[in-house]
């Protein structure tokens, strides 16, 4: 597994300090020989007689050589650098289970930390409001501005991580380092404006873990196993804000509101250490570096990666247009994408409204402490795990069964679990709304919370899977704009939850939200049945 650290931050640092001796990449290791197809491709500019001698030498070698991949040669004479063979150890898809597990652990840890940092302030809001004498709305900005920051960040970080000359790791390293440094003044600041500005910046620089985490998992995971990996990643995104109130709920009443921010700093420090060992997972980025090394090794400028060949014909204005304009255009002109953006944003906003409504139910009505309230949030994790066996069974016995038969299932088949999930969302909300009463046991509304989060998990997972397949070319940009929409709606939800429940109460306020999700049930079934017709009419859907 040591060779995987070659392109990790610790590997790059070690190689720089050792003058290239420590953890050298494949092309710089002693005894490396250029694969025969690449040698032949490089000699095509040589005299014909020398080419024939090279070919005769290769044909005379034993037939036990590896099944090398033939490099493509463009009309301009560029040799496209790719994977040397189907078993190339530098290809992330060929890494060992242990190496892939390392990527999973580190990406999920970053995701957990960033989401945990959102909700950990919820337990400190009461004391923060008392200490600084500010209104509830100003206090809620401590959470909502963080959410706004991590929704805005992907508009920059996602396109950046897709550039092969950049890759996944630099955005991770730069952003987590800045996040860690920002967490120090955030933990000690003693004025409201400074704290709120720092919280927004924390969210902005924490967003790469959310924006590109799924892409990192996809880099090392085969198509048939990807739904399992992405669901585990989704569990971490729910577990972060669910565990945060438990951590802060027991410590803040004893140590003060600053303690919640110290806990963020410690978590960020742990993530930073683990991040140093995260290998580069982007295939195009790895091949970009390989092409640079081959040019240095052979002195032949014809060796180029596919990204270098493509960028020669790319216009900067077109790149910016595809990244920033096309997602908005698709949302405006494609009803399927518009519905999924609004629906995902709605259920996400409802989830964040829990941080305002649950204290009204469990502290005000059932006289729980902050720590006990934090334990209630763990029901969100139970909800995601509750539907995990069913989702995995559907993926294995239905979706992947088609792949095993050589059949490519239509994208709408990925929405089948979401049909059930879309029903669970309003059922859970209605149950929570009308059982959140002092005369009923607190377990009953908690069951509603569990059901709603279970449904939300299925909906989000299936919709993302559908968009990735049905709109393959624009999926990265669509996910970035979806992140933005979710964050902005969550920001709004945090801010309007208190006025909503002040005016309507818990029962009627939650019923209003449940009613909005009832309409989305019909939208989900419509997308499932009429999705193929909508895609045929779309200018943006994949064939």
Swiss-Prot record:
Keywords: Cell membrane, Glycoprotein, Membrane, Transmembrane, Transmembrane helix, Transport. GO terms for molecular function: fluconazole transmembrane transporter activity. It holds the Pfam family MFS_1. The chain crosses the membrane at residues 101-121, 141-161, 178-198, 203-223, 230-250, 259-279, 335-355, 374-394, 415-435, 440-460, 476-496, 512-532. The keyword Transmembrane applies. CDD domains: MFS_Tpo1_MDR_like. Belongs to the major facilitator superfamily. CAR1 family. It is a multi-pass membrane protein. This is MFS-type transporter pyvG. One of its GO terms (biological process) is xenobiotic detoxification by transmembrane export across the plasma membrane. It is found in: Cell membrane. GO terms for cellular component: plasma membrane. May be involved in the secretion of pyranoviolin A. Its main location: membrane. The keyword Transmembrane helix applies. Glycans are attached at residue 94. InterPro entries: MFS, MFS_trans_sf. Residues 24-71 are annotated as: Disordered.
